[in-house]
C-alpha cells in the first residue's frame, strides 16, 4: 500500500468533488480533519456522514472540539478540563477515529481564550488521551517567518497571519508542547506540517527519536518546499 501522510480540512461542500479527486488519483483511503467552518460551525456531522457512505476502512475522521468551551469555562480550569474530556469521548462514541486540534494555530489562540497547553486546564485531556491511546492531529504554530514583518509573504499577511507581540510566540508554544510530552510521553501525536521544523530538521529528528509515538505529517505550505530544497542532501538524509 502506498501512503502519503498529509491531511485535508473537510466541510459538507467537499463530498462529491473529493470523490472525483480520490478516483482520479487512486486514493484508496483518507483521513478527514474537522475544523469549524466560519470559526464556530462544526463539520463533524458532515465528515461522519461521508465516512458512513463509504466502505469501511476507507475514510477516517478526526473530530474537532467545540470552541464555545473556551468562553463557557474561561477562568475555570477544572470545568474546562472535564468538558474537553467529555467532548473528546463523545466524538469517539459518534464514530470519530481521533481528535483534530487547531488550537495551536497562533491566530486561533489570538481570537479564543485558550489556556496554555501545559496548564491544569489541559491536564485531564492529555491524561485521558494518553491512557486511551487516542490519535491526535495537532496544528502547532505556523511558518517562523509569520512573526517577521520583513519575511512574511503577502498572501499570509492578507489572511491575518502576521503575528506581532500581541500573539503567542512560536518558541513559547514549542516549549509548551515539549512540557506536555515530558509529562505524557505516550501521547499519540501527529504534528501537522512537519511541526514547522522543515528548516530545523536536526531538532525535529531529536524530537522523533525521544518520543516514538510522535509523528509528523507532510502537508506542505510553500515554506516546506523552500526549506527542504535549501539543503537537499540533509532533507534526503532525514527522510531516509
Outline where the language-model segments fall.
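Short, surface-exposed connector motifs at secondary-structure boundaries
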Residues: 1-2, 159-162, 183-190
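Hydrophobic faces of well-ordered beta-strands that scaffold small-molecule active sites
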Residues: 3-8, 29-33, 59-64, 99-101, ...
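H/E-rich (His + Asp/Glu) clusters that bind or coordinate divalent metals
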Residues: 12, 172-175, 179, 188-240
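Generic structural signal for hydrophobic
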Residues: 21-22, 91, 129, 180
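Glycine-enriched alpha-helix->loop->beta-strand junction motifs that scaffold or abut catalytic
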Residues: 25-28, 95-97, 131-135, 183-188, ...
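Active-site gating/metal-coordination segments in enzymes
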Residues: 44-161, 166-168, 222-223
Amino acid at each position: 500500500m502506498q501512503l502519503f501522510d498529509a491531511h485535508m480540512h473537510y466541510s459538507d461542500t467537499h463530498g462529491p468533488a473529493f470523490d472525483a479527486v480520490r478516483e482520479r488519483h487512486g486514493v484508496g483511503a483518507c483521513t478527514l480533519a474537522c475544523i469549524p467552518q466560519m470559526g464556530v460551525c462544526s463539520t463533524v456531522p458532515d465528515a461522519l456522514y461521508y465516512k458512513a457512505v463509504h466502505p469501511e476502512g476507507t475514510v477516517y475522521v478526526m473530530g474537532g472540539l467545540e470552541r464555545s468551551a473556551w468562553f463557557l469555562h474561561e477562568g475555570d480550569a477544572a470545568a474546562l478540563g472535564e468538558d474537553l474530556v467529555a467532548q473528546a469521548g463523545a466524538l469517539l462514541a459518534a464514530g470519530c477515529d481521533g481528535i483534530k486540534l487547531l488550537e495551536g494555530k497562533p491566530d486561533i489562540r489570538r481570537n479564543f481564550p485558550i489556556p496554555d497547553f501545559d496548564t491544569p486546564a489541559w491536564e485531564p485531556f492529555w491524561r485521558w488521551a494518553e491512557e486511551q491511546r487516542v490519535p491526535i492531529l495537532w496544528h502547532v504554530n505556523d511558518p517562523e517567518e509569520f512573526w517577521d514583518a520583513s519575511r512574511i509573504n503577502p498572501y499570509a499577511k492578507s489572511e491575518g497571519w502576521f503575528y506581532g507581540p500581541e500573539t503567542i510566540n512560536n518558541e513559547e508554544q514549542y516549549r509548551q508542547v515539549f512540557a506536555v510530552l515530558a509529562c505524557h510521553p505516550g501521547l499519540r501525536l501527529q504534528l501537522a506540517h512537519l511541526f514547522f521544523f522543515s528548516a530545523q530538521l536536526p531538532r525535529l529528528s531529536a524530537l522523533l527519536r525521544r518520543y516514538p509515538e510522535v509523528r509528523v505529517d507532510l502537508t506542505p505550505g510553500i515554506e516546506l518546499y523552500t526549506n527542504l530544497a535549501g539543503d537537499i542532501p540533509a532533507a534526503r538524509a532525514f527522510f531516509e
